[in-house]
């Protein structure tokens, strides 16, 4: 005797199948995001991440690398750390700030720049390219900061030219969003930079679970999910403030949130 399947079971089975299919598609999407998203992000970001240093006719080599920068806005604005630039308190010695942009392979192009603004209390600087075509620009995150535990990526030139100038990418976890200066630090343990930071009010920074090296300073930190820039690697500001209580600074990497950068870009083309 032939029996007809129960309608309720058919509907339930259909819902189960649809749920399983949706879960599989979500998992596939996650795998694709993790497996293909990062290579795409790296490929897209490399032309926008630049060498920052100084040029002097009598130096050998004439270009001296100092740190990483990245292009935003209209393709003529470069962001980096203030400490990457020559110290303005020192006598002029003929050095000028210069940026080198990647042309593919091992080719780099020197570009003249002018310093637009320097915020030393935030250790951020904004440069403007002079002459030549715009450079592909990165997108700055405009919303709230990423949540602790988020997957991040940062790019730069660790160890500078010692290993050759090649973009290097690192994965990182946002381990903590923490204050720049510990409130319990005694006044005599603070550097002048830390005292200025306290005077200017609280400032949150990102603590990452990856190690950045000299040369990474000024480089972009990306949200691995969206590809937007959420921070700027900084290897100096936190060492002179948050870690001033330590006799031996740690290998922890810090980054400045882009919220500190946005006010410096208000009068520039977007």
Predicted region positions:
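N-terminal export leaders
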Residues: 9-16
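Active-site region of chymotrypsin-like
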Residues: 45-62, 130-138, 168-266
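Short, well-ordered loop/turn sites that connect or cap secondary structure elements
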Residues: 72-73, 91, 146, 224
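Active-site substrate-binding loop(s) of clan PA
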Residues: 40-41, 88, 116, 130-166
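Catalytic-histidine neighborhood of serine endopeptidases
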Residues: 73-120
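Bacterial N-terminal signal peptides
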Residues: 16-27
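A conserved glycine-rich beta-strand in the N-terminal activation segment of trypsin-fold
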Residues: 36-38, 55-81, 111, 218, ...
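Sec/Tat signal peptide C-region and signal peptidase I cleavage site
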Residues: 30-33
């Amino acid at each position: 005797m032939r029996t007809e399947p129960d309608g309720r079971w058919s509907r339930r089975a259909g819902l189960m199948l649809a749920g399983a299919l949706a879960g599989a598609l979500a998992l596939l999407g996650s795998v694709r995001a993790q497996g293909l998203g990062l290579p795409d992000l790296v490929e897209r970001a490399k032309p926008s991440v630049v060498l920052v240093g100084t040029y002097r006719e009598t130096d050998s080599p004439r270009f001296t690398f100092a740190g990483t920068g990245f292009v935003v806005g209209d393709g003529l604005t470069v962001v980096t750390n203030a400490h990457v630039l020559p110290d303005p308190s020192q006598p002029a010695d003929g050095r000028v700030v210069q940026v080198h942009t990647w042309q593919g392979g091992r080719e780099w192009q020197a570009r003249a720049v002018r310093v637009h603004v320097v915020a030393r209390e935030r250790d951020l600087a904004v440069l403007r390219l002079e002459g030549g075509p715009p450079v592909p620009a990165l997108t700055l995150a405009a919303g709230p900061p990423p949540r602790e535990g988020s997957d991040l990526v940062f790019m730069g030139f660790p160890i500078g030219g010692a290993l050759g100038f090649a973009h290097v990418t690192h994965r990182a976890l946002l381990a903590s969003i923490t204050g720049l200066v510990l409130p319990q630090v005694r006044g005599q343990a603070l550097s002048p930079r830390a005292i200025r930071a306290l005077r200017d009010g609280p400032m949150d920074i990102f603590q990452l679970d990856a190690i950045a090296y000299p040369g990474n300073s000024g480089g972009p930190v990306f949200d691995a999910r969206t590809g937007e820039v959420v921070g700027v690697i900084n290897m100096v500001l936190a060492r002179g403030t948050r870690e001033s209580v330590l006799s031996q600074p740690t290998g922890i990497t810090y980054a400045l949130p882009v919220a500190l950068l946005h006010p410096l870009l208000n009068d520039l083309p977007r």
